[in-house]
Regions:
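Single conserved hydrophobic/aromatic residue that forms the stacking wall/gate
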Residues: 1-13
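Alpha/beta catalytic cores of nucleotide-metabolism and tRNA/nucleoside-modifying enzymes
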Residues: 11, 15-17, 21-141
Length: 141
């Protein structure tokens, strides 16, 4: 955990907390343990972009939001990859999207196999097929 000082606007200094912030509880602990002014979330958001919403809610209310469902997680992964492909083109976009997909499947049944499968995604259709298989496997269909 790090609480470093960086120069802000004018003569204002903001102490930033960074490291191992993955949810609201760890963000709150960072504030309390370091006395920082703000918390940065890095790898804790990989494959979990909703973590920012969850942390904000926890810090404001002290309540944890329910876990994101597998359907929601796959919908976000799909949209994320579609947006990458929209801006980069499908060929380059899917090359870049592979690493993101690997983060989204972390913790799912057979995640090691799924991460390897992510490395072979070449088209958006490949992604859709993988998502269908994940949902069928996770939901027992």
């Amino acid at each position: 955990r790090d609480s470093s000082t960086s120069r802000g606007l004018g003569d204002v200094y903001k102490r930033q907390g960074n490291g191992d912030v993955v949810d609201g509880e760890s963000a709150k602990a960072m504030y309390e343990q370091t006395g920082c002014d703000l918390v940065m979330i890095g790898r804790g958001s990989y494959g979990r972009p909703w973590v920012f919403r969850d942390v904000k809610h926890y810090l404001e209310t002290g309540e944890k939001l329910p876990e994101v469902s597998i359907e929601e997680k796959m919908a976000v992964m799909k949209k994320h990859c579609e947006l990458i492909c929209k801006y980069k083109g499908e060929r380059q976009g899917m090359k870049e999207a592979r690493k993101n997909c690997a983060w989204y499947v972390k913790g799912l049944k057979g995640s090691a196999r799924l991460r390897a499968q992510c490395g072979g995604l070449n088209t958006i259709s490949d992604l859709y097929e993988m998502i269908d298989h994940i949902l069928a496997n996770e939901l027992g269909e």
